A protein has these predicted regions:
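Periplasmic-binding protein-like
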Residues: 109-112
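Sequence-specific dsDNA recognition surfaces
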Residues: 1-15, 29-58
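Non-catalytic DNA-recognition/assembly elements of restriction-modification systems
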Residues: 1-9, 132, 136-161
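A short glycine-rich beta-alpha junction/loop motif
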Residues: 65, 79-86, 98, 118-140
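A short beta-sheet element
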Residues: 27-28, 44-105
Length: 161
């Protein structure tokens, strides 16, 4: 699995477009805080902005890396991300995608990110900080069983929310 940082074409206002050939410009404001999936964007960029940004594809895993850092999302769309995101490529090579989502959503991993992100003016994550997080990696079959149990508990809790 590879981790890459997003990038922004500058000045961004020169790249924003309403044209039908525009590329989804995925921003942190496009996602719900407690959401799981990225399904649409409010803005698009011109195709010329692709080479100055980072393309993401359906199934890529996105992680916020600044300000409200450490929030995971699964992209359901093609688009480009700015430097406030990290993209985790090909996570399904080693992870059940839902297991990775719950792992990255856990207090266990978030607390590691808090420690790693502190020390600068603005708390943020980078590729090295995310890559150095300590995780337990059970076999894929066991990951799927864990996900099934988590989702069973979530279904029991949801009526009370």
């Amino acid at each position: 699995m590879g981790i890459e940082r997003g990038g922004s074409p500058r000045p961004i206002k020169s790249y924003i477009t309403a044209d039908s050939d525009g590329i989804n410009w995925i921003k942190i404001g496009d996602v719900d805080k407690d959401g799981k999936y990225i399904t649409n964007t409010k803005e698009k960029i011109k195709p010329t902005g692709i080479k100055k940004s980072r393309e993401v594809y359906p199934g890529d895993f996105l992680l916020t890396n600044s300000m409200s850092f450490g929030r995971p999302y699964i992209s359901k769309i093609y688009g480009c991300i700015h430097d406030g995101w990290l993209v985790l490529r090909n996570p399904d090579a080693v992870f059940d995608i839902n297991f990775l989502y719950y792992l990255l959503s856990s207090n266990y991993l978030y607390n590691q990110f808090v420690i790693k992100a502190s020390g600068s003016t603005v708390d943020n994550l980078n590729i090295d900080k995310v890559s150095s997080a300590l995780i337990c990696l059970p076999p894929l079959k066991e990951q799927t069983m864990i996900v099934n149990q988590i989702e069973k508990i979530i279904r029991l809790i949801q009526p009370f929310e």
